[in-house]
Amino acid sequence: MDPVDPKLEPWNHPGSQPTTPCNKCYCKVCCWHCQVCFLNKGLGISYGRKKRRPRRGTPQGSKDHQNPVPKQPLPITSGNPTGSEKPKKEVASKTETDPLD
């Protein structure tokens, strides 16, 4: 290695800067242009600020998406609404009649 002038900053050392400027091309050659291009283009890592995407406007035909829900009749259930008491009585009578001893 050649001796480097200690007065030079590290980013100004010979060979630290590529001879051609960076571009926006994503081909294989440009991905290996420099370390920054490799991180951004090759690996997809960028540490810069991300641009905000503008929100999409509402379509002209819609009105705030506030369509009311149509009223639907309640479902009619068949049977006893209070529940069946018959099985309870049967269970109670069976337990009383069975001798345990």
Curated annotation (Swiss-Prot):
> Which parts of this chain are annotated as the region Cysteine-rich?
22-37
Task: Extract the ranges annotated as region (Transactivation).
Answer: 1-48
State the UniProt keywords alphabetically: Acetylation, Activator, AIDS, Apoptosis, Host cytoplasm, Host nucleus, Host-virus interaction, Inhibition of host innate immune response by virus, Inhibition of host interferon signaling pathway by virus, Interferon antiviral system evasion, Isopeptide bond, Metal-binding, Methylation, Modulation of host chromatin by virus, Modulation of host PP1 activity by virus, Phosphoprotein, RNA-binding, Secreted, Transcription, Transcription regulation, Ubl conjugation, Viral immunoevasion, Zinc
- Motif Nuclear localization signal, RNA-binding (TAR), and protein transduction, chain ranges: 49-57
Q: How is it modified after translation?
A: Asymmetrical arginine methylation by host PRMT6 seems to diminish the transactivation capacity of Tat and affects the interaction with host CCNT1. Acetylation by EP300, CREBBP, GCN5L2/GCN5 and PCAF regulates the transactivation activity of Tat. EP300-mediated acetylation of Lys-50 promotes dissociation of Tat from the TAR RNA through the competitive binding to PCAF's bromodomain. In addition, the non-acetylated Tat's N-terminus can also interact with PCAF. PCAF-mediated acetylation of Lys-28 enhances Tat's binding to CCNT1. Lys-50 is deacetylated by SIRT1.
Q: Which residue ranges are recorded for the region named Interaction with the host capping enzyme RNGTT?
A: 49-86
Gene Ontology MF terms: actinin binding; cyclin binding; metal ion binding; protein domain specific binding; protein serine/threonine phosphatase inhibitor activity; RNA-binding transcription regulator activity; trans-activation response element binding
Biased composition, class Basic and acidic residues, residue ranges: 85-101
Pfam families the UniProt entry points to: Tat
Q: Where is this region: Core?
A: 38-48
Q: Where is this cross-link: Glycyl lysine isopeptide (Lys-Gly) (interchain with G-Cter in ubiquitin)?
A: K71
Region named Disordered: 48-101
GO BP terms in the entry? DNA-templated transcription; positive regulation of transcription elongation by RNA polymerase II; positive regulation of viral transcription; symbiont-mediated perturbation of host chromatin organization; symbiont-mediated suppression of host innate immune response; symbiont-mediated suppression of host translation initiation; symbiont-mediated suppression of host type I interferon-mediated signaling pathway
At which residues is there a site annotated Essential for Tat translocation through the endosomal membrane? W11
The entry's Zn(2+) 2-binding residues are C25, C27, C30
Notes concerning its domains: The cell attachment site mediates the interaction with ITGAV/ITGB3 and ITGA5/ITGB1 integrins, leading to vascular cell migration and invasion. This interaction also provides endothelial cells with the adhesion signal they require to grow in response to mitogens.
Q: What else is known?
A: HIV-1 lineages are divided in three main groups, M (for Major), O (for Outlier), and N (for New, or Non-M, Non-O). The vast majority of strains found worldwide belong to the group M. Group O seems to be endemic to and largely confined to Cameroon and neighboring countries in West Central Africa, where these viruses represent a small minority of HIV-1 strains. The group N is represented by a limited number of isolates from Cameroonian persons. The group M is further subdivided in 9 clades or subtypes (A to D, F to H, J and K).
Q: Briefly, what is this protein's role?
A: Transcriptional activator that increases RNA Pol II processivity, thereby increasing the level of full-length viral transcripts. Recognizes a hairpin structure at the 5'-LTR of the nascent viral mRNAs referred to as the transactivation responsive RNA element (TAR) and recruits the cyclin T1-CDK9 complex (P-TEFb complex) that will in turn hyperphosphorylate the RNA polymerase II to allow efficient elongation. The CDK9 component of P-TEFb and other Tat-activated kinases hyperphosphorylate the C-terminus of RNA Pol II that becomes stabilized and much more processive. Extracellular circulating Tat can be endocytosed by surrounding uninfected cells via the binding to several surface receptors such as CD26, CXCR4, heparan sulfate proteoglycans (HSPG) or LDLR. Neurons are rarely infected, but they internalize Tat via their LDLR. Through its interaction with nuclear HATs, Tat is potentially able to control the acetylation-dependent cellular gene expression. Modulates the expression of many cellular genes involved in cell survival, proliferation or in coding for cytokines or cytokine receptors. Tat plays a role in T-cell and neurons apoptosis.
Subunit (UniProt): Interacts with host CCNT1. Associates with the P-TEFb complex composed at least of Tat, P-TEFb (CDK9 and CCNT1), TAR RNA, RNA Pol II. Recruits the HATs CREBBP, TAF1/TFIID, EP300, PCAF and GCN5L2. Interacts with host KAT5/Tip60; this interaction targets the latter to degradation. Interacts with the host deacetylase SIRT1. Interacts with host capping enzyme RNGTT; this interaction stimulates RNGTT. Binds to host KDR, and to the host integrins ITGAV/ITGB3 and ITGA5/ITGB1. Interacts with host KPNB1/importin beta-1 without previous binding to KPNA1/importin alpha-1. Interacts with EIF2AK2.
Supply the name of the protein: Protein Tat
Which source organism does the UniProt entry give? Human immunodeficiency virus type 1 group M subtype G (isolate 92NG083) (HIV-1)
Gene designation:
tat
